[in-house]
């Protein structure tokens, strides 16, 4: 799996969410709405999710192993650090 494109939209509002990211995998598959969150231990990514009928949030798409999650987080956070704020 190769991440062939990362698009970052930084958020300049108050709160813990810092950006919304879209990634392209192998120039063939796009995942939208990955969030960059500021946590107590630093930045991390949250995969796109949906609120279920019981009020819990469930990931729509996510890596199935730690190695892939770590790789994805590293790539997304590196792109986040390089991105500039865009005024809306």
Swiss-Prot record:
Could be involved in septation. InterPro entries: SpoVG (IPR007170), SpoVG_sf (IPR036751). The keyword Nucleus does not apply. Gene3D superfamilies: Stage V sporulation protein G. Keywords: Cell cycle, Cell division, Septation. This is Putative septation protein SpoVG. One of its GO terms (biological process) is division septum assembly. Pfam families: SpoVG. Belongs to the SpoVG family.
